[in-house]
Amino acid sequence: MSNTQTVKAVAKYIRMSPHKVRRVLNQIRGRSYQEALMILEFLPYDAGGPVWQVVHSAAANAKNNYGLDKKKLIIEEVFANEGPKLKRIRPRAQGRAYSILKPTCHITVIVKGTS
């Protein structure tokens, strides 16, 4: 029976809607580390950048903390949770003010590797 190790990396307070980030995360779920980086490199979405950084960080954690080989890593779990909303006010006509909610999210990547 092979020994598997899971490693986690989290990026918090990313100034992006979790809905838009999940669209990117669905593309890399269950793929190998190198395949995921290749996909993220060429996706036309802005969310690809922060997700690439978190995946890269998870692989670095696996290598430095547990001595795992990056080539053998598989993305086991990825998800984006909702963070706090930044509240802004936009002045409108006749003394009114509209509130603008700028969403943030927390991206979590869990990679699995065999030692």
Swiss-Prot record:
One of its GO terms (cellular component) is chloroplast. Gene3D superfamilies: Ribosomal protein L22/L17 (3.90.470.10). Keywords: Chloroplast, Plastid, Ribonucleoprotein, Ribosomal protein, RNA-binding, rRNA-binding. The keyword Cell membrane does not apply. Pfam families: Ribosomal_L22. One of its GO terms (molecular function) is structural constituent of ribosome. It is found in: Plastid, Chloroplast. The keyword Ribonucleoprotein applies. InterPro entries: Ribosomal_uL22 (IPR001063), Ribosomal_uL22_bac/chlpt-type (IPR005727), Ribosomal_uL22_bac/org-type (IPR047867), Ribosomal_uL22_CS (IPR018260), Ribosomal_uL22_sf (IPR036394). GO terms for biological process: translation. Belongs to the universal ribosomal protein uL22 family. Part of the 50S ribosomal subunit. This protein binds specifically to 23S rRNA. The globular domain of the protein is located near the polypeptide exit tunnel on the outside of the subunit, while an extended beta-hairpin is found that lines the wall of the exit tunnel in the center of the 70S ribosome. This is Large ribosomal subunit protein uL22c. It comes from Trieres chinensis. The lineage of its organism: Eukaryota, Sar, Stramenopiles, Ochrophyta, Bacillariophyta.
